[in-house]
From Swiss-Prot:
Gene Ontology biological-process entries: thiamine diphosphate biosynthetic process
A Pfam family hit: ThiG
EC number(s) stated in the UniProt entry for this protein: 2.8.1.10
Keywords: Cytoplasm, Schiff base, Thiamine biosynthesis, Transferase
The protein's name: Thiazole synthase 1
Family: Belongs to the ThiG family.
A Gene Ontology cellular-component term: cytoplasm
Length: 258
């Protein structure tokens, strides 16, 4: 399968994985391995600096995975920028998944504060991957600001509803000059396959892997879904049409056409 390129860096996997909600760090590590992912997101607020032996980061091989700190929990641009700076000061690479979600109930991203934070972080040398509503206009503004990707949601975080914003994501993909990563709401392998068939460059999944009784098994299923969707997109899906069209000719065998 062709490689994903973000900010000049190449990845063989197009599946990004989040680290929240897993019942244990060992289950998370097994899921990461089964997913084949090379980009792993982690909330800085979940890192236990005082107990490194029990810390989440102790279970993530930094030589194998790109650790992508996220600004989960930030309610405005100032908080998001502060979290990104803390991650870099803690030794993380200057890559950040930008999340600004002032509403704790639906966790929908704030477009104004996200753009404001992105502009600041790009100027400070961060590789910014912003989580956004499926808003084509905002996506263009973020690309113009210098973000490395745009990450439109398929559905609200953790809902497992799939690609409910399909029409808007299709516009974003059509207009994008950076990779498009569909993030949030993807609850089944068929959902990620759908996103990849549309032409998305990658997907990010967390809840669907973390809450299943078999995280590693589900991670493998998502890996296969991403690969199938990407291969179908590259091969070229047939156009949909209203009328039926037989795959074999119906004439000249049972009867002669006049």
């Amino acid at each position: 399968m062709d490689e994903l390129v973000i900010a000049g860096r190449s990845f063989s996997s197009r599946l990004m994985v989040g680290t929240g909600k897993f019942a244990s760090n060992s289950l998370m590590a097994d899921a990461l391995a089964a997913s084949g992912s090379q980009i792993v997101t982690v909330a800085l607020r979940r890192v236990d600096i005082d107990r490194p032996e029990d810390d989440l980061l102790a279970h993530i091989d930094r030589d194998k995975y790109l650790l992508l700190p996220n600004t989960s929990g930030a309610r405005d641009a100032d908080e998001a920028v502060r979290l990104a700076r803390l991650a870099r000061a803690a030794g993380c690479e200057p890559w950040v998944k930008l999340e600004v979600t002032p509403d704790p109930y639906y966790l929908l991203p704030d477009p104004i504060e996200t753009l404001k934070a992105a502009e600041i972080l790009v100027k400070e040398g961060f590789v910014v991957l912003p989580y956004i509503n499926a808003d084509p206009v905002l996506a263009k503004h973020l690309q113009e600001a210098g973000t490395a990707t745009v990450m439109p949601l398929g559905a609200p975080i953790g809902t497992n509803k799939g690609v409910r914003t399909r029409d808007n994501i299709a516009i974003i993909i059509e207009q994008a000059i950076v990779p498009v990563v569909v993030d949030a709401g993807l609850g089944a392998p068929s959902h990620v396959a759908e996103a990849m068939e549309m032409g998305a460059d990658a997907v990010l999944v967390n809840t669907a892997l973390a809450v299943t009784p078999d995280p590693a098994g589900m991670a493998n299923a998502f890996r296969l879904g991403v690969e199938a969707g990407r291969r179908a997109f590259l091969a070229g899906l047939p156009a949909q049409q209203q009328k039926a069209e037989a795959s074999s000719p119906l004439t000249g065998f049972l009867r002669d056409e006049q």
